């Protein structure tokens, strides 16, 4: 089974990426957090892989930016009712450290923010992940409401993403290039500057 891939980012889609390893393209399913953190097209990426086989779908590769992400994905799927889609959804809203914190606080509401995860399944996840090694670091008892709270984005960032989407750029790609541009240009960046930088990153 494949455990890790290092290669050039050939394509980035809504739910997957194509990684070119010495001329062989691997389709890797990734959550939105992982996709947003991939480097630009043509640049080298390293993904930790969980390989799964089923008679209906064949071999599927699930990619993660860190070993902890992959471990959390495996631990989540060991719970009855949690498949790959639900596990990815949980990790889209909670990092492994945030998930460990939610489990320690028995905060099923935080877990229940994941798409497709109802109250009963969220409770089962919180209950069954207790004492599981979700993260290598210390578990922080973060106050409710602070778990997975996304930093406030300046309005120009959202406007730039919307503008790129209006030009036909997929949302995940638009967010990735705009966030990268915002990090380089700083908080004072204008919408126009972010759009221009984003288009340059996309090669348009």
Swiss-Prot record:
InterPro entries: DNA_helicase_Holl-junc_RuvA_I, NA-bd_OB-fold, RuvA, RuvA_2-like, RuvA_C, RuvA_C_sf
Broad class of the protein's primary localization: cytoplasm
Location of region: Flexible linker: 143-152
Cellular compartments annotated: Cytoplasm
Residues covered by region (Domain III): 152-204
Region Domain II: start-end pairs: 66-142
Pfam families: HHH_5, RuvA_C, RuvA_N
GO biological process: DNA recombination; DNA repair
GO molecular function: ATP binding; four-way junction DNA binding; four-way junction helicase activity
GO cellular component entries: cytoplasm; Holliday junction helicase complex; Holliday junction resolvase complex
Region: Domain I, residue numbers: 1-65
Chain coiled-coil ranges: none
Keywords: Cytoplasm, DNA damage, DNA recombination, DNA repair, DNA-binding
Family of this protein: Belongs to the RuvA family.
Complex and partners: Homotetramer. Forms an RuvA(8)-RuvB(12)-Holliday junction (HJ) complex. HJ DNA is sandwiched between 2 RuvA tetramers; dsDNA enters through RuvA and exits via RuvB. An RuvB hexamer assembles on each DNA strand where it exits the tetramer. Each RuvB hexamer is contacted by two RuvA subunits (via domain III) on 2 adjacent RuvB subunits; this complex drives branch migration. In the full resolvosome a probable DNA-RuvA(4)-RuvB(12)-RuvC(2) complex forms which resolves the HJ.
UniProt function note: The RuvA-RuvB-RuvC complex processes Holliday junction (HJ) DNA during genetic recombination and DNA repair, while the RuvA-RuvB complex plays an important role in the rescue of blocked DNA replication forks via replication fork reversal (RFR). RuvA specifically binds to HJ cruciform DNA, conferring on it an open structure. The RuvB hexamer acts as an ATP-dependent pump, pulling dsDNA into and through the RuvAB complex. HJ branch migration allows RuvC to scan DNA until it finds its consensus sequence, where it cleaves and resolves the cruciform DNA.
HAMAP family on file: DNA_HJ_migration_RuvA
Domain topic, free-text comment: Has three domains with a flexible linker between the domains II and III and assumes an 'L' shape. Domain III is highly mobile and contacts RuvB.
Protein name per UniProt: Holliday junction branch migration complex subunit RuvA
Organism lineage string: Bacteria, Pseudomonadati, Pseudomonadota, Alphaproteobacteria, Caulobacterales
């Amino acid at each position: 089974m494949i455990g890790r891939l290092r290669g050039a980012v050939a394509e980035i889609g809504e739910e997957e990426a194509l990684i070119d390893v010495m001329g062989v393209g691997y389709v890797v399913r990734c959550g939105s957090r992982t996709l947003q953190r991939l480097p630009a097209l043509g640049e080298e990426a390293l993904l930790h892989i969980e390989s799964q086989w089923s008679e209906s779908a064949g071999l599927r590769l699930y990619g993660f930016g860190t070993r902890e992400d992959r471990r959390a994905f495996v631990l989540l799927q060991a719970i009855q009712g949690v498949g790959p889609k639900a596990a990815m959804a949980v990790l889209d809203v909670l990092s492994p450290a945030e998930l460990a914190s939610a489990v320690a606080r028995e905060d099923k509401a935080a877990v229940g923010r994941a798409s497709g995860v109802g109250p009963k399944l969220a409770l089962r996840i919180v209950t069954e992940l207790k004492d599981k090694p979700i993260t290598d670091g210390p578990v922080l008892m973060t106050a409710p409401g602070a778990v997975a709270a996304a930093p406030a984005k300046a309005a120009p960032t959202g406007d730039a993403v919307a503008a790129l989407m209006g030009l036909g750029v997929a949302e995940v790609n638009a967010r990735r290039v705009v966030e990268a541009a915002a990090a380089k240009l700083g908080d004072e960046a204008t919408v126009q500057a972010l759009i221009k930088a984003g288009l340059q990153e996309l090669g348009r």
